[in-house]
Amino acid sequence: MIARRLIQSATPLEEAGLLQVQAVGVRAPFFFPLGMPRDEVEQVLCDILKPDQWHYYEIPQTAVRSEDVVADCGAAEGLFTLTVAHRCRHVFAIKPAPAFVKALGRTLAGLANVSILPYALAESDGAVRLSAGGITSRVTDAGDGQVVPSRAIDSLFIRQGRRVDYLKADLEGAEISMLRGAIETIRACAPRIAITTYHRREHAEQIAALLRDIHPDYHIFVKGIMPQDGRPVMLHAWMDDAA
């Protein structure tokens, strides 16, 4: 299996309740909750490290720059934050599930320009329920999930005087809700955006329409095709002065 060749070592840290994973070709280790199934770890690494995957966020028009403040929405295992932290001003890594927030803290330890925000992202502030889906847990109406605090991007950023120059998002289907809670920030900052669209068939068109409603001059580029049903994988958006 290709993913297995991406794992150099996997070391349980029993006292910390974490699994330390060294990926081939990545200098820093990743940390996952100790009980995370091996096949899920392998799939995560496959998605982010295989060269033929469409699950990458930077293209020339949406590349991270040295003065950028980056919102990593759905920071997951922390690879995107690790990749860009050394070449931007600051990264806010946002992830709600407590077990993964703890793991993310170990993965990103020592990076002075990284802040972890332990929230789900939604249209408004409050609380949401997460499914028990591990790293791919998502907002659910089912009664057996974990309740976590939710925040709107606008509450975390523009209303606190923080700008956002780059917005990266993979929220397991909650992307539209996040964007509706980010309208003030997007209107004020016009960030470059890279956002997943494959969780729901209709999201590529809906996200493009929402962004152009906020800023009609946004350029939109959609890339990648899910082999199962042809859904696009990623949407990139940028303004002319960001090209």
Place the predicted regions along the sequence by residue.
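Phosphate/nucleotide-binding beta-alpha loop and adjacent structural elements of enzyme active sites
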Residues: 1-243
